[in-house]
Design a protein with these regions (language model features):
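C-terminal regulatory/oligomerization modules of transcriptional regulators
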Residues: 1-10, 63, 90-93
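A cross-family signal for key residues in well-ordered alpha-helices
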Residues: 18-21, 54, 89
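Basic amphipathic alpha-helical segments that dock to polyanions
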Residues: 49-51, 55-56
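Glycine-centered, phosphate/nucleic-acid-interacting loop/turn motifs that mediate DNA/RNA or nucleotide
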Residues: 60
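Short E/K-rich amphipathic alpha-helical oligomerization segments
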Residues: 63-69
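Basic, amphipathic "hinge/linker" alpha-helix immediately C-terminal to the N-terminal HTH DNA-binding motif
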Residues: 70, 74-92
């Protein structure tokens, strides 16, 4: 059994759960999600976050929309879908 692989899988699962919990509070863009995770003392970088967001979007757990930003290019805001809310409720019960 590869302990490093198990650690990576656990970390990924925890990050996915945390992302859903952040989005449960309201829509957010990637840098806000990273900031919230860092505030919770979780180490995460964009290269880790974007694949997780893409996977969760492909699973139907979240969606996104583009919004103009007064400080530069448009921002992609992520939000939970109903399926994502239901899935998060199941995760809350499991934890």
């Amino acid at each position: 059994m590869n302990i490093d692989n198990n650690k990576a899988q656990m970390r990924k699962g925890i990050l996915e759960y945390c992302i859903l919990m952040i989005l449960e509070k309201g829509d957010a863009y990637a840098s806000t999600i990273i900031s919230d995770l860092k505030d919770a003392e979780m180490i995460v970088v964009e290269g880790t976050l974007y694949p997780l967001l893409t996977r969760q979007k492909n699973q139907g757990l979240l969606t996104y929309r583009w919004e103009e930003s007064p400080q530069g290019p448009p921002r992609k805001y992520y939000s939970l879908t109903e399926q994502g809310r239901d899935y998060l409720k199941e995760l809350h019960q499991s934890w």
